Amino acid sequence: LIEQLNSLNMSLIVTAYTQEGIVIGADSCITTNFTQEGKELYKHSHCGNKLFLLNKKIGISTCGDAIINGILLSSLIDQYIWSKKEENITLLQVEIDLKNIVNNQAKGKEYYVIFHICGYENGKRYVSKFDNNDKESHIKDVSERDGCIYDGQVDIVDLFSQDVAYRGTDGLYYDINIERCRYNELSLQETIEYVYFLISTTIQHMRFTYKKDNVGFPIDILVIMPNESLWLQKKELHIPGNY
C-alpha cells in the first residue's frame, strides 16, 4: 500500500545570459518519494522534460513539483505551447499563464514549481525567475548586464558563485576567495560550456557522495539569440539499447 506519493524534479536548471545570447540548461532526473508500509522510499526517472521552447523565441525551464494533481507538468506545458503556437505572445503573458496553469490544475492543493523564462523583445534581453505562488512579475531587462540564475539542487553550484568560509581549528571562520565567472567576456560557446559544466559537475559530485541523486543525465541545452533559437541537445523518443 502506497500511503503518500510526491514527484519532484528538484534537480537543476541554469540560465546564463551573455553578450551573444541566452543559454538554458536542465537535467532530466525526477525523484518520486513515497511511503510504503511505514518506510520512506524513492524512485528515479531520467526521462523528465524540464526545458521547453515556445514559438521559437521564448525559453521555459522548471524545477520543483513535477506532477500536479496527477498530471505531468511537462504535459501541461506542452499543451500550452501548442495552444499558443500562432500567437505573438509576450514574456509577461507567459509568466502569468504558467502560474495559472499550475494553480488551476492544483485545485486548492499546495504545489511548488519554480520557472525560468527568457527571450528577446524589441531588441532587449529579458529573464524571469519565479514560482507559481508569486503575486508579482519578476521579468528583468538584462540587456546591459551579463550573469546567471539557477535553481533546484544548487549547493554545488553555490561553491562556484557564492561566498564560502571554512572553520579553522581555533573555531573561527575564514573567508575563501572565490574567483567569479567573467560573464561579460564569455562567448556564446563558452556560455554553453559553462552551463553544461555546472549541471554535469553537480551530477558527478552526487555520484561520488552519499547525496540522493536528485540531478541526472541527460542534459538538455537550449540557446536563444536575438534572431533565432536552437536546441544543442534535446532528449528524443527512442528504443532503449539495452533491451
Predicted features, each with a name:
Residues L5-Y243:
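N-terminal nucleophile
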